Protein backbone atom coordinates (compact mmCIF):
# COMPACT_ATOMS: atom_id res chain seq x y z
CA UNK A 1 0.00 0.00 0.00
CA UNK A 2 1.11 3.55 -0.63
CA UNK A 3 -0.51 4.61 2.62
CA UNK A 4 2.00 6.21 4.96
CA UNK A 5 -0.71 7.97 6.97
CA UNK A 6 -0.32 6.31 10.36
CA UNK A 7 3.41 7.08 10.35
CA UNK A 8 2.77 10.81 9.89
CA UNK A 9 1.91 11.15 13.59
CA UNK A 10 5.23 9.51 14.51
CA UNK A 11 7.17 12.11 12.52
CA UNK A 12 4.72 14.96 13.19
CA UNK A 13 4.54 16.02 9.56
CA UNK A 14 2.62 15.59 6.32
CA UNK A 15 4.71 12.91 4.59
CA UNK A 16 2.37 12.03 1.72
CA UNK A 17 1.83 15.66 0.66
CA UNK A 18 -1.95 15.65 0.96
CA UNK A 19 -1.95 18.87 3.02
CA UNK A 20 -2.63 17.38 6.44
CA UNK A 21 -1.36 14.81 8.90
CA UNK A 22 -3.24 11.53 9.10
CA UNK A 23 -6.32 11.30 11.32
CA UNK A 24 -8.24 8.01 11.15
CA UNK A 25 -11.33 9.89 12.39
CA UNK A 26 -11.20 12.24 9.41
CA UNK A 27 -10.48 9.93 6.48
CA UNK A 28 -12.58 9.30 3.38
CA UNK A 29 -12.99 5.64 2.51
CA UNK A 30 -14.85 3.78 -0.21
CA UNK A 31 -16.46 0.39 0.33
CA UNK A 32 -14.94 -2.52 -1.60
CA UNK A 33 -17.74 -3.71 -3.91
CA UNK A 34 -16.98 -7.42 -3.46
CA UNK A 35 -17.71 -7.26 0.30
CA UNK A 36 -21.46 -7.89 0.27
CA UNK A 37 -22.23 -9.07 3.82
CA UNK A 38 -24.19 -6.25 5.43
CA UNK A 39 -26.41 -8.02 7.94
CA UNK A 40 -25.91 -9.64 11.33
CA UNK A 41 -24.15 -8.34 14.42
CA UNK A 42 -20.73 -9.18 12.94
CA UNK A 43 -21.25 -7.34 9.63
CA UNK A 44 -18.52 -4.86 8.78
CA UNK A 45 -17.33 -3.43 5.48
CA UNK A 46 -13.93 -3.68 3.83
CA UNK A 47 -13.01 -0.15 2.70
CA UNK A 48 -10.09 1.62 1.03
CA UNK A 49 -8.73 5.14 1.18
CA UNK A 50 -7.49 7.07 -1.87
CA UNK A 51 -3.99 5.59 -1.52
CA UNK A 52 -5.13 1.96 -1.26
CA UNK A 53 -4.99 1.66 2.53
CA UNK A 54 -7.41 -0.97 3.83
CA UNK A 55 -9.93 -0.34 6.60
CA UNK A 56 -12.57 -2.25 8.50
CA UNK A 57 -15.61 0.02 8.62
CA UNK A 58 -18.56 -0.34 10.98
CA UNK A 59 -20.93 2.59 10.93
CA UNK A 60 -18.76 5.71 11.00
CA UNK A 61 -15.78 3.96 12.63
CA UNK A 62 -12.77 3.08 10.46
CA UNK A 63 -10.08 0.71 11.73
CA UNK A 64 -6.95 0.75 9.56
CA UNK A 65 -5.54 -2.70 8.76
CA UNK A 66 -1.85 -2.71 9.71
CA UNK A 67 1.02 -5.05 10.50
CA UNK A 68 2.66 -5.42 13.92
CA UNK A 69 4.83 -2.36 13.16
CA UNK A 70 1.69 -0.24 12.65
CA UNK A 71 2.39 0.04 8.91
CA UNK A 72 -0.36 -0.30 6.30
CA UNK A 73 -0.56 -3.69 4.58
CA UNK A 74 -1.27 -4.34 0.91
CA UNK A 75 -2.99 -7.33 -0.64
CA UNK A 76 -3.85 -5.86 -4.06
CA UNK A 77 -1.28 -6.58 -6.75
CA UNK A 78 -0.90 -8.06 -10.23
CA UNK A 79 2.13 -9.73 -11.82
CA UNK A 80 2.67 -11.23 -15.27
CA UNK A 81 5.44 -13.76 -15.68
CA UNK A 82 6.08 -16.91 -17.77
CA UNK A 83 2.81 -16.65 -19.68
CA UNK A 84 0.66 -16.33 -16.56
CA UNK A 85 -0.93 -13.39 -14.80
CA UNK A 86 -1.32 -13.59 -11.05
CA UNK A 87 -3.70 -11.14 -9.40
CA UNK A 88 -4.50 -10.66 -5.74
CA UNK A 89 -7.32 -8.52 -4.30
CA UNK A 90 -8.59 -7.89 -0.79
CA UNK A 91 -12.13 -9.20 -1.20
CA UNK A 92 -14.14 -9.12 2.03
CA UNK A 93 -13.93 -8.87 5.81
CA UNK A 94 -16.29 -9.95 8.58
CA UNK A 95 -16.33 -9.77 12.34
CA UNK A 96 -15.95 -13.05 14.22
CA UNK A 97 -17.78 -13.60 17.52
CA UNK A 98 -15.65 -16.44 18.91
CA UNK A 99 -17.41 -16.74 22.26
CA UNK A 100 -21.04 -16.09 21.18
CA UNK A 101 -21.45 -13.02 23.40
CA UNK A 102 -22.70 -10.80 20.53
CA UNK A 103 -19.46 -8.80 20.33
CA UNK A 104 -16.77 -8.97 17.69
CA UNK A 105 -13.62 -10.67 19.03
CA UNK A 106 -11.57 -10.46 15.81
CA UNK A 107 -12.00 -10.09 12.07
CA UNK A 108 -11.38 -12.41 9.14
CA UNK A 109 -10.12 -10.98 5.85
CA UNK A 110 -10.52 -12.89 2.58
CA UNK A 111 -8.08 -12.26 -0.26
CA UNK A 112 -8.81 -13.68 -3.72
CA UNK A 113 -5.86 -14.93 -5.77
CA UNK A 114 -6.44 -15.49 -9.48
CA UNK A 115 -4.04 -17.33 -11.77
CA UNK A 116 -4.72 -16.84 -15.48
CA UNK A 117 -2.95 -18.75 -18.25
CA UNK A 118 -2.51 -16.05 -20.88
CA UNK A 119 -2.45 -18.57 -23.77
CA UNK A 120 -5.58 -20.56 -22.94
CA UNK A 121 -7.32 -17.91 -20.77
CA UNK A 122 -7.94 -20.64 -18.18
CA UNK A 123 -8.43 -19.15 -14.71
CA UNK A 124 -7.85 -20.79 -11.33
CA UNK A 125 -8.84 -19.13 -8.06
CA UNK A 126 -7.42 -19.69 -4.61
CA UNK A 127 -8.36 -17.95 -1.39
CA UNK A 128 -6.22 -16.61 1.42
CA UNK A 129 -7.67 -15.70 4.82
CA UNK A 130 -6.04 -13.83 7.64
CA UNK A 131 -7.36 -12.94 11.07
CA UNK A 132 -7.13 -9.35 12.22
CA UNK A 133 -7.38 -8.11 15.81
CA UNK A 134 -10.08 -5.66 16.87
CA UNK A 135 -7.32 -3.01 16.81
CA UNK A 136 -6.72 -3.78 13.10
CA UNK A 137 -3.43 -5.68 13.45
CA UNK A 138 -2.89 -8.60 11.05
CA UNK A 139 -2.07 -11.93 12.74
CA UNK A 140 0.11 -13.62 10.10
CA UNK A 141 0.15 -16.88 12.10
CA UNK A 142 -3.54 -17.39 11.21
CA UNK A 143 -2.99 -17.22 7.44
CA UNK A 144 -4.68 -19.98 5.42
CA UNK A 145 -4.91 -20.85 1.71
CA UNK A 146 -7.58 -22.98 0.07
CA UNK A 147 -11.11 -23.16 -1.23
CA UNK A 148 -13.51 -20.26 -0.77
CA UNK A 149 -16.32 -22.41 0.57
CA UNK A 150 -14.34 -23.21 3.72
CA UNK A 151 -14.61 -19.57 4.80
CA UNK A 152 -18.03 -18.57 3.48
CA UNK A 153 -19.84 -19.10 6.80
CA UNK A 154 -17.33 -16.93 8.70
CA UNK A 155 -17.53 -14.21 6.06
CA UNK A 156 -21.33 -14.52 5.73
CA UNK A 157 -21.25 -14.41 1.94
CA UNK A 158 -21.02 -16.60 -1.14
CA UNK A 159 -17.38 -16.23 -2.22
CA UNK A 160 -17.20 -18.83 -4.99
CA UNK A 161 -20.39 -17.77 -6.80
CA UNK A 162 -22.22 -21.11 -6.52
CA UNK A 163 -25.34 -19.42 -5.10
CA UNK A 164 -25.05 -20.54 -1.49
CA UNK A 165 -23.02 -20.05 1.66
CA UNK A 166 -21.31 -23.32 2.54
CA UNK A 167 -21.30 -24.34 6.17
What positions do the PLM features span?
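Long, low-complexity, Gly/Thr
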Residues: 1-167
Amino acid sequence: SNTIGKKESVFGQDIDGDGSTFDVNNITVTAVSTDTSTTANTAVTLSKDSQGGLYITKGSTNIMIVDSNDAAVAFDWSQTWAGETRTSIAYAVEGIDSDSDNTIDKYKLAVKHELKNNSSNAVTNQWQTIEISTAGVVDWSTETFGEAKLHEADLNQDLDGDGSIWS
